């Protein structure tokens, strides 16, 4: 089942489960306390948009109702949501109405920012954050109302963030290029003009929109420039992994697959989804996974296995779904020993748990339980093979999914968390993982390059190497996918720079890969998927078809590695 379909029909647990285990790797008994929910509503804060754009729009993302979200809404998220001072989304009563973006209940959080999809013509119809220049917003007193100019708030927040990055980068020896400086200067000048006419909402909004246009471009350009600056002053990173999944193996000629795969990649992930890998409990079907593994290792490709545990409906057979929690723990220990020992030292890493923070939780496990499952798997994997790396894989860094779950009590009882919060929980609980994994599909971040890397940087503080475990974007429609109805032609403004095509897919890949490669705390980037039509993102493969037709993005990966080496210090 697709994630967008799952979101429509799934719901979260409303109560905790007390558990016990006889395993050699016991976990603590878990109880979820009953809670009394307080009234946290205060005065109303309204962010009023001024639609100064020239096109037909839409220019501000909105949904009719959180109760009626459908597939098209999930494919192109457009709802507003609030975030805290650590940029973690949280449930609130924020909603876009005809009057603007309204919020009056932040669930007790004193300071917050808002996140909206806003159309900056010439750049994109994309998610961005207003956070009052990093000082954040507070709700008015009960019974009061305050109205802010949305255009102005977005502009001054983005300009402030750019200033912060520029100051940081200059301290590290970088200087903006002649090409970049006009974007920075114009964003500042237009914002200064907007401040001078702040009492004239229309004029302020127009000037703010111009500032926002230049600041969005400046934000991306300065991140890319700084990346190339860092690449040039450091040695080439021979140990950096460029990888991809192997789902195309067996769906195209295997010799052709191996040739094209190993020409581009030195890292591979082999999936072990239970419906095909373990349709019946304790009966393992390794199938061509062993063949893939052997061929890849012979070619010198480093391999990761994934996942040991994933509670999504797509990958949870009935025999596992029907287990008690204590029996799930016993199964997890047994399963971990089996797969880790099967491949031995030749397997570089195992993804111990996948997407445990989000709504794909058909087993209705609580965050604390998922943390304990991760801890158990990490301990058992290490006990089975101390040499294997242990990776936690998270998705949806934007965490907009937090807002679309309507039961307020669910959120107040903290039964869903962001990826950043889940890693923090694992770290604080002593989960013995060695790699932090984060997915960065464009269609699931819906953020520009600057926001994407800043969000990812929050993971540095946990002190683990970071892998971009899954990354990708579409190459746009093809004649076949349009005629078949699998890919609908857009009826809204483009989301990033222009409409997606093969060249834009390659441009996005080149820019975000360069930024990520330049960060010494990131050890790998893995594109998903290799070949269409088997890609998770529609038309998101590097090969256009199983016959091996190469897209521009495939060529760009190979050229990019050569360019990094050429520009490096040594």
What is the predicted function of each stretch?
Residues 262-275, 280, 348, 354, ...:
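Aromatic- and acid-rich polysaccharide-binding/catalytic face
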Residues 1, 21-44:
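C-terminal segment of N-terminal export signals and the immediately downstream linker at the start
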Residues 60-103, 239-290, 295, 301-325, ...:
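N-terminal substrate-binding region of glycoside hydrolase catalytic domains
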Residues 269-279, 290-366, 371-399, 478-479:
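Substrate-binding cleft and catalytic face of glycoside hydrolase catalytic domains
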Residues 243-247, 375-414, 467-471, 524-529:
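Aromatic-lined carbohydrate-recognition surfaces of secreted/lumenal glycan-active proteins
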Residues 342, 351, 356-376, 380, ...:
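Aromatic-rich peripheral "rim/lid" segments of glycoside hydrolase catalytic domains that contact
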